[in-house]
């Protein structure tokens, strides 16, 4: 790094280390400064995402935890996903926005290390929560008579995810540094006593190896696995619909199963789409940062980062849009009313492996009245 001209601070260009992505300090020309109107617009956008991310995920967590009948495998994993999104909204958005605009770190050494560490942990937890949800849906639909995860399995899976996330993020606690090194040869008064926060790996090869590993661990690998699971689910449901008899209850259950699968798949697709621009930006910058013009770096990074952060709002939006129970409970939540079980009002949706479809043999032997009772008893409430 050329500290004399100081055209850039060292890069933090990995998928999870988005908030510490290198800042270009183009103090030689005012042309590189963002217009006030653009800064104001970005501030409003970031503020809106923070508010939606925090309130939406907090409401979703509170509603699911308060309603005992909603504590099934899928909803437990949804709570874990929302909690990780909540951490990202709190620990990432405000710090990243301020750091990118100011081009120097003002939050102290402890936050310099904790900020990227917590962000990396949160994103790892988010993507692997989606993996576990895909596995749960796969077993429920593809192999209903085989092994099916229960609530205890979900808690164990969540614990394993957090351990994996913490271990894979440890390099940020080790190599993240707060230093004034880039400013030591700068004579401008505006940059005196200023610090930057970035990762200082032993070598570029170490950094590139680690960032490439995280790219596969946090994005491409899990998403490929998830889409394979949902593709198999789609094929099975399509065959089941073609073979399904014309019983109204069967058609109702099939419709509800399809709706909940669309909701879960939509969350995955939104995650992949939101994170794609920042993933491409970081990958390109990691391997050939000269491609990105100095004056366009901060604006381009903020736009990519803001798009990625929208993913923190997706979970409660899709969950609420496709779940009438959540919409009703959300009204109670914002009206500060007590949550209470409303068995008569809840729609029934086969969300969890805790209560799966009864076998075809038992359905054939059951009378229409008994069949309807089985359906009502076996469907999950979310």
Swiss-Prot record:
Disulfide bonds, paired cysteine numbers: 112-197
4Fe-4S is among the record's keywords: no
Pfam families: 7tm_1
Residue list for modification Phosphoserine: 367
Entry keywords, A to Z: Cell membrane, Disulfide bond, G-protein coupled receptor, Glycoprotein, Lipoprotein, Membrane, Palmitate, Phosphoprotein, Receptor, Transducer, Transmembrane, Transmembrane helix
Top-level taxon of origin: Eukaryota
GO molecular function, one term: neuropeptide binding
Membrane topology designation: Multi-pass membrane protein
Lipid attachment points (S-palmitoyl cysteine): 337
Residues exposed to the Cytoplasmic side: 55-75, 137-153, 232-259, 320-382
PROSITE patterns: G_PROTEIN_RECEP_F1_1, G_PROTEIN_RECEP_F1_2
Family: Belongs to the G-protein coupled receptor 1 family.
Protein name per the record: Neuropeptide Y receptor type 1
Species in which this protein is naturally found: Canis lupus familiaris (Dog)
């Amino acid at each position: 790094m050329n500290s004399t001209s100081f055209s850039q601070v060292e890069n933090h260009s990995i998928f999870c280390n988005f908030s510490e992505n290198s800042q270009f300090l183009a103090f030689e020309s005012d042309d590189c400064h963002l217009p006030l109107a653009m800064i104001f617009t970005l501030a409003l956008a970031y503020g809106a995402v923070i508010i939606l991310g925090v309130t939406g995920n907090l409401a979703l967590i509170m509603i699911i935890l308060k309603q005992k009948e909603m504590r099934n495998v899928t909803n437990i994993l949804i709570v874990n996903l929302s909690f990780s999104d909540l951490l990202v909204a709190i620990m990432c958005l405000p710090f990243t926005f301020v750091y990118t605009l100011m081009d120097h770190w003002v939050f102290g050494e402890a936050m310099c290390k904790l900020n990227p560490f917590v962000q990396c942990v949160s994103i790892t937890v988010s993507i692997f929560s989606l993996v576990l949800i895909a596995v749960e849906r796969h077993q429920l639909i593809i192999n209903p008579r085989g092994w099916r995860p229960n609530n205890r399995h979900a808690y164990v899976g969540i614990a394993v995810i957090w351990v994996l996330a913490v271990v894979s993020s440890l390099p940020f606690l080790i190599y993240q540094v707060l230093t004034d090194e880039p400013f030591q040869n700068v004579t401008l008064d505006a940059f005196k006593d200023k610090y930057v926060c970035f990762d200082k790996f032993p070598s570029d090869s170490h950094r590139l190896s680690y960032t490439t590993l995280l790219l596969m661990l946090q994005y491409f690998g899990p998403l490929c696995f998830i889409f394979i699971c949902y593709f198999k689910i789609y094929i099975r449901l399509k065959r089941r619909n073609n073979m399904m008899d014309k019983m109204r209850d069967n058609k109702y259950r099939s419709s509800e199963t399809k709706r909940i699968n669309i909701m879960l798949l939509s969350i995955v697709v939104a995650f992949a789409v939101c994170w794609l621009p920042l993933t491409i930006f970081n990958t390109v910058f990691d391997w050939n940062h000269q491609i990105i013009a100095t004056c366009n770096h901060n604006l381009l990074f903020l736009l990519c980062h803001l798009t990625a952060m929208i993913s923190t709002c997706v979970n409660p939006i899709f969950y609420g849009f496709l779940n009438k129970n959540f919409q009703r409970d959300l009204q109670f939540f914002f009206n500060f009313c007590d949550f209470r079980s409303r068995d008569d009002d809840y729609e029934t949706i086969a969300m969890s492996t805790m209560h799966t479809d009864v076998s075809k043999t038992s359905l054939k032997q059951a009378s229409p009245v008994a069949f309807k009772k089985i359906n009502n008893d076996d469907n999950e409430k979310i």
